[in-house]
A protein has these predicted regions:
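Active-site residues of response regulator receiver
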Residues: 57, 87
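Conserved acidic carboxylate
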Residues: 8
Length: 135
């Protein structure tokens, strides 16, 4: 089963992401979506990993997505975890900054469930549902 941490302050966007991930037919082993409504909450949830992927917004109260990515990349236990940014910040500069801080992908909102699913599978190790067991 895949474990994906979704960090997004908008409840409707978290629900959209969850539904897109859970409805993807490529996930025959299932997806465990763990939700955080802020960067601070994500920091509390990271030790409960491991996660196969972290999906994060940039603009959030307290700790923003870029600060979260910096923390993840400095963390010995999470530094190899792929990170996907989902954001309304659409300039080339915003995208370059997120990727230079260690994000593996960057989607500009709004996007379709299919675009999200394709990007998620691109970022997963080997691009398959054969994720490591969690326990």
């Amino acid at each position: 089963m895949l474990r994906i941490l979704v960090v997004e302050d908008s409840a409707s966007m978290r629900s959209f992401v969850r539904n897109a991930l859970e409805s993807d037919s490529r996930s025959s082993a299932g997806v465990d979506v763990v939700e955080a409504s802020s960067g601070f909450e994500a920091l509390r949830l990271l030790p409960r990993g491991p996660y196969d992927l972290v999906i994060t917004d940039i603009n959030m109260p307290d700790i923003n997505g870029l600060e979260l990515i910096s923390f993840i990349r400095k963390s010995e236990s999470h530094k190899a975890t792929p990170v996907l940014i989902i954001s309304t910040q659409s300039s080339e500069r915003d995208r370059a900054r997120g990727l230079s801080l260690g994000a593996n992908g960057y989607l500009i909102k709004p996007f379709s469930p299919e675009v999200l699913q394709t990007e998620v599978w691109r970022l997963l190790p080997n691009g398959t549902a054969q994720a490591k067991p969690h326990g």
